[in-house]
Regions:
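Extracytoplasmic ligand-binding site segments that recognize negatively charged/polar headgroups
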Residues: 1-126
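A bilobed periplasmic-binding-protein/Venus flytrap-type ligand-binding module shared by bacterial periplasmic
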Residues: 40-47, 89-91, 163-175, 194-195
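Loop/turn elements at helix/coil->beta-strand transitions in domains of secreted/extracellular proteins
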Residues: 70-74, 128-131, 149-151, 179
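Short amphipathic alpha-helical coupling segments at ligand-binding clamshell hinges
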Residues: 99-103, 174-186, 194-197
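Extracellular/periplasmic bilobal clamshell ligand-binding domains
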Residues: 211-247
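Periplasmic-binding protein-like
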Residues: 23, 36-37, 67-70, 103-108, 114, 185-208, ...
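A ligand-binding cleft/hinge motif common to bilobed small-molecule-binding domains
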Residues: 1-3, 126, 131-150
Length: 247
């Protein structure tokens, strides 16, 4: 949606509701965040029964490196070549910390499995096929996992990326006035309450997410467009393949 707006395919929406959206959760007057998605780790309780739960990526790196017999073939993460979310999370990790590339190399040596989507990783951890899944959407896991699940959600303490679900009004909309009304409702107090309590999509002011240690919202700014450049994306994916896939 950022690229669509940058390329001129979205309408400006200037209302009291859109003006109330925090600056980090909107881009110009065209792209607006309406819900939050913490990016988390999922662990298998059975596999971690006698292991310390890592709270930072440095701890995760040391843990999987020192327990290769447990984690060999049993770590999952997004495939950034086929998943837009996976590419976004990987590039944000790389921007945030050099640990990402060391982590990718170790996961590669342990033959990490690559996935298209969060739901597949959740299922694999819950069944015990994976011991750990890295960088998946927390709200999906909260919505899908039963109370007695084998899977446990872990939010890192060094930093937790927060993905923004966003909305736009396309210039091709056949009912732009209706689109603006719906957008205004999404980001209104009533709309945010419904998203938070009924749709199970954390609202922009969600109190649980607000308390996460070192939360890092993926801000809607021009930095997101950098990695959409064709040459930069190709370079990043080459580095990724060299680190993780290690062909």
């Amino acid at each position: 949606q950022m690229k669509l707006a940058n390329d001129g395919f979205t309408q400006a929406v200037d209302t009291a509701e859109t003006n109330a959206v925090p600056g980090w959760a909107r881009w110009r007057t065209e792209v607006f965040g309406f819900a939050l998605e913490p990016v988390v780790m999922l662990i298998s309780k059975k596999d971690f029964a006698n292991l310390p739960v890592p709270r930072t990526r440095h701890e995760m790196l040391a843990l999987i490196r020192n327990n290769s017999s447990i984690f060999k073939d049993r770590i999952g993460t997004y495939n950034p070549e086929t998943s837009g979310a996976g590419y976004l999370f990987s590039t944000q990790d790389a921007r945030q910390s050099d640990t990402f590339w060391r982590l990718a190399e170790v996961m590669g040596r342990l033959n990490a499995k690559l996935y298209c989507c969060t739901s597949k990783m959740i299922e694999a951890v819950d069944k015990g096929d994976l011991a750990l899944a890295y960088n998946l959407l927390g709200s999906y896991a909260n919505a899908i996992l039963p109370a007695n699940s084998n899977a446990q959600i872990i939010a890192f303490e060094d930093y937790t990326h927060i993905l923004l679900r966003t909305a736009i009004v396309p210039i091709t909309s056949q009912n732009p006035a209706g689109g603006i009304r719906f957008l205004n409702f999404l980001i209104s107090s009533d709309g945010q309450s419904i998203l938070d309590t009924e749709a199970k999509l954390p609202a922009l002011n969600n109190s649980v997410i607000d308390k996460l240690a070192n939360r890092k919202p993926i801000r809607l700014d021009s930095g997101l467009l950098v990695f959409l450049d064709r040459l930069k994306k190709a370079h990043f994916l080459r580095e990724w393949n060299a680190a993780l896939i290690q062909n």
